């Protein structure tokens, strides 16, 4: 398994909860199509084992243990926390929202993306078994909070947002009229409503255009999906 090279052993040892399940995002296939090194959403060490000496699950113990803060509990923040904790550091994860998982949790609620919650599920299970990790929700972090905590290092993993500026892979100038009633992907995921027929212009060429189209259609909207 690309997502978990130790899948057979974990099944044999009845460690099902430790399996990093494939989420079916096909970024591995996309890597091959674009002739770039293999990538995997669940296994960031893939294709780097020999080049960088990265192991999928074993992290060398740090010579000096530190108190560390990870601001943000999305996929990147949880992965950073897990690697740092496995190295033996004391890790605090602070998430400003009421849920841990960030983008993977939000997008897993869209039609067809339920498996994407596995990105957070695997990491949260591992972190919750570790005595050197604290997880906090409803905890927005700013410079003053970092100073008060007196940690050795802070890792900022506060995420990104889908653009809503009319630009895309093939559009280097804004699409004319995009500002008239346009909604960002983030707004739609968070429940924003749009009256009347909806046109989705997909200049990402991956998954989100199709997913948002299906999501809005299931809500009863008249949807037209357009690609370059």
Task: Give the predicted meaning of each segment.
Residues 1-71, 75, 80-91, 99, ...:
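Flavin-dependent oxidoreductase catalytic cores
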Residues 1-13, 123-138, 144-145:
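Repeat-solenoid scaffold signature
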Residues 18-24, 106-135, 165-180:
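N-terminal glycine-rich dinucleotide-binding loop that anchors FAD/FMN and/or NAD(P) in oxidoreductases
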Residues 40, 127, 216:
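Hydrophobic, well-ordered secondary-structure elements that form the walls
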Residues 62-93, 135-147, 158-171, 179-228:
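Rossmann-like dinucleotide/flavin-binding elements
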Residues 148-152:
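Glycine-rich phosphate-binding loop signature in dinucleotide/nucleotide-binding domains
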Residues 155:
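N-terminal Rossmann-like NAD(P) cofactor-binding module of classical short-chain dehydrogenase/reductase
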């Amino acid at each position: 398994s690309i997502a978990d090279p130790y899948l057979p052993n974990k099944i044999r040892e009845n460690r099902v909860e430790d399996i990093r399940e494939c989420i079916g995002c096909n970024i591995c296939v996309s890597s091959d199509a674009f002739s770039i090194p293999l990538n995997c959403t669940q296994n960031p060490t893939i294709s780097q084992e020999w080049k960088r000496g990265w192991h999928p699950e074993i992290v060398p113990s740090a010579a000096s243990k530190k108190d560390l803060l990870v601001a943000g509990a999305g996929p990147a923040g949880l992965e950073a926390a897990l690697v740092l904790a496995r190295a033996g550091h004391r890790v605090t994860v602070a998430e400003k929202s009421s849920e841990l998982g960030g983008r993977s949790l939000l997008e897993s609620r869209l039609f067809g993306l339920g498996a994407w919650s596995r990105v957070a599920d695997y990491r949260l299970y591992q972190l919750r078994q570790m005595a050197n990790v604290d997880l906090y929700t409803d905890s927005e972090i700013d410079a003053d909070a970092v100073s008060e905590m007196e940690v050795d290092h802070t890792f900022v993993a506060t995420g990104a947002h889908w653009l809503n500026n009319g630009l895309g892979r093939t559009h280097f100038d804004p699409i004319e009229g995009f500002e008239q009633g346009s909604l960002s992907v983030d707004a739609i995921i968070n429940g924003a409503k749009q009256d009347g027929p909806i046109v989705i212009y997909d200049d990402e060429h991956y998954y989100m255009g199709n997913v948002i189209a299906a999501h809005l259609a299931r809500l009863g909207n008249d949807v037209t999906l357009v690609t370059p």
